[in-house]
């Protein structure tokens, strides 16, 4: 039997829908990692053909591999081939979407040491090409998540090249609080739809 493209799409969507049903977890209350919650959210969007957003693979160069068993290989030495840019990218309603996700246990600020110059430069390039670029910032102790537009992150970074932590008051003033949900867990596309597609940031 020949699998034509539309059949392959249906198979993929069906597979993702099953995965999504198996991952019915409220990460804010059940200890699910922030990254896992975002991945589950992206699976939800994909399964319903709302958006196609994927986590970028990290480019790694394998240097040494051991074979403790013939059927199993163990990587014992590797290094990053190049600096990574942002965590996620994809397409939503014809718009390129690119974002980074960060998490902290602090209650009053997000450490800027987690952001690097090459990431800031990458976000600047995405904005120059009219892409939708932002960061999702999760305060695990407060159980609060914010969508901060890349413009606001870049402006704060440029003050002192990212040497100071970003106060949560700055994030609340310049960003958008993401309401936790069950399906999807981190509905960041709601922010884009309401504020960037025909909204104040358009």
Curated annotation (Swiss-Prot):
GO CC annotations, alphabetized: cytoplasm
Catalytic activity: Endonucleolytic cleavage at a junction such as a reciprocal single-stranded crossover between two homologous DNA duplexes (Holliday junction)
Chief place where the protein resides: cytoplasm
BP term (GO), one: chromosome segregation
GO molecular function: endonuclease activity; magnesium ion binding; nucleic acid binding
Keyword DNA damage among UniProt keywords: yes
Alphabetical keyword list: Cytoplasm, DNA damage, DNA recombination, DNA repair, Endonuclease, Hydrolase, Magnesium, Metal-binding, Nuclease
Localization (cell): Cytoplasm
Cofactor(s) needed by this chain: Mg(2+)
Site (Transition state stabilizer): 102
EC number(s) on file: 3.1.21.10
Family, similarity comment: Belongs to the RecU family.
HAMAP family registered for this protein in UniProt: RecU
Function as written in the Swiss-Prot or TrEMBL entry: Endonuclease that resolves Holliday junction intermediates in genetic recombination. Cleaves mobile four-strand junctions by introducing symmetrical nicks in paired strands. Promotes annealing of linear ssDNA with homologous dsDNA. Required for DNA repair, homologous recombination and chromosome segregation.
Protein name: Holliday junction resolvase RecU
Lineage, broadest ranks: Bacteria, Bacillati, Bacillota, Bacilli, Lactobacillales
């Amino acid at each position: 039997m020949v699998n034509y493209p539309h059949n392959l799409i249906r198979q993929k969507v069906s597979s993702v829908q099953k995965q999504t049903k198996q991952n019915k977890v409220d990460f804010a209350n059940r200890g699910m990692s922030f990254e896992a919650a975002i991945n589950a959210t992206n699976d939800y969007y994909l399964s319903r053909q709302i958006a196609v957003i994927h986590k970028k693979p990290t480019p790694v160069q394998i240097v040494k591999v051991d074979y403790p068993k013939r059927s199993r290989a163990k990587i014992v030495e590797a290094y990053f081939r190049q600096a990574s840019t942002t965590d996620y990218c994809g397409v939503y309603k014809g718009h390129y979407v690119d974002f980074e996700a960060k998490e902290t246990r602090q209650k009053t600020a997000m450490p800027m040491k987690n952001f690097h110059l090459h990431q800031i430069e990458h976000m600047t390039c995405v904005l120059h090409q009219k892409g939708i670029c932002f960061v999702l910032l999760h305060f695990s102790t407060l159980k609060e998540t914010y969508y901060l537009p890349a413009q606001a992150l870049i402006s704060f970074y440029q003050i002192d090249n990212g040497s100071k932590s970003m106060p949560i008051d700055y994030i609340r003033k310049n960003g958008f609080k993401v309401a936790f949900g069950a399906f999807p867990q981190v509905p960041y596309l709601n922010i884009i739809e309401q504020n960037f597609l025909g909204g104040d940031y358009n």
